[in-house]
Amino acid sequence: MYYPKFFKRLVSSLIIGGQAINYVFKGKISRNDLFEQLMESGPGSLLIVLITGIAAGTVFNIQVASQLTSMGVSSEIGGLLAVGMAREMAPLLTATLMTGKVATAYAAQLGTMKVTEQIEAITMLRTEPIQYLVVPRLLSMIIMSPIQCLLFLSVSLWSGQIWSTIFYNVPPIVFWTSVRSGNVSLTSSDLSSMIIKSVVFGLIISIIALSLIHI
């Protein structure tokens, strides 16, 4: 029976994700491989995350600040920027960046290994390819996605504060007070939601990228 390619990819992703998560719960994790993948998905993609965070914070802040300043409520700029970034922009843009920088590298690595029959060789050596190749990469994405998301949020707020002060004469103390305790301010639930979203995005992205091992 013929099955569409997208259906095969979906089934492959579900299978590989389930197997990898099973190995994680059993504690079958190579620390050396995990550390190597953390270096690739962390410091290896840090620069692009920081640059995009600065750009996003600048653009978002200029749009928000211009409207709020014209209405005479420039003291709320920081809070609106923080909430908008934490709830939607930071996890979404971070996931997009991690997809382009890290997930594509994972897919290319496993695709090359499959074409050159390295995965079959690993299996013949009685090493489980899911445990050896997938688990470290999956965990690295799950661990580094929220960390990168927090860095993205921090940089975007810092960038927004600088431009608010330069263009709209908003004192830094007013900006950061708005972030912490304004009418619209950043709360622990916003941060928790952002972390959960980034973890889920990291899990989904890595499973899809690593499903090539079964295709």
Where are these regions (language model features)?
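Short, membrane-interfacial amphipathic segments enriched in basic
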Residues: 2-34
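Active-site cofactor/substrate anionic-group-binding motifs, chiefly glycine-
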Residues: 41-93, 97
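Selective transmembrane-helix segments that form parts of the transport pathway or gating/packing helices
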Residues: 42, 46, 50, 89, ...
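Short cytoplasmic-facing helical segments at TM-TM junctions of multi-pass membrane proteins
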Residues: 110-135
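Hydrophobic alpha-helical segments embedded in or immediately adjacent to the lipid bilayer
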Residues: 134-178, 197
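Hydrophobic alpha-helical transmembrane segments of polytopic membrane proteins
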Residues: 176-211
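Conserved small/polar residues in nucleotide/adenosyl-binding loops
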Residues: 214-215
